[in-house]
Amino acid sequence: ISNKYNSVTFGKNILIGKNVKIGSNTSIGNNTTIEQNVYVGKNCLIGSNITIKNTIIGDNVVVQDGCKIGVKGFGFVPLKDKNFRFPHIGRVLLNNNVELGANCTIDRGSIGDTVIGENTFLDNQVHMAHNVKIGKNCMIAGQVGFAGSTTVGNNVSIGGQAGISGHLNIGN
């Protein structure tokens, strides 16, 4: 049995932080955490066992089970004999009509934002590092990994298990 409030359906064991806004006709699955200052648009389907931080989600977005969105990226600065983690203060922006397959991990930006364009679909287990930008109408197959600060244009398809190095610009 689920709970419904203002046309939003909530599963069991959900944690919602302060200043979270959730649009109408959205469904949130069991054991999902939405941390403070997250915006979720209308007509979204947010699955179970998901963590969302530092993220703005557009309308008609599907996030399948197990995704981690807006987590801290892997960014370090080597100084003398130690590595120091640099801050990740950016966000994740999921535009309208985006779909994330199960167990995707989308890191928030270090200073700017990590962005997925409208009508873009990610298959299961895709990883996007900090500051990656994917254009509109892209299809990304399973187990693709994007290293930090890579930009992908519009209407791009990427086959399964591809590894994309950091700081690249892939055109339309």
Residue ranges and their predicted role:
Residues 2-172:
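Structural signal for interior beta-strand "rungs" in well-ordered beta-sheet cores
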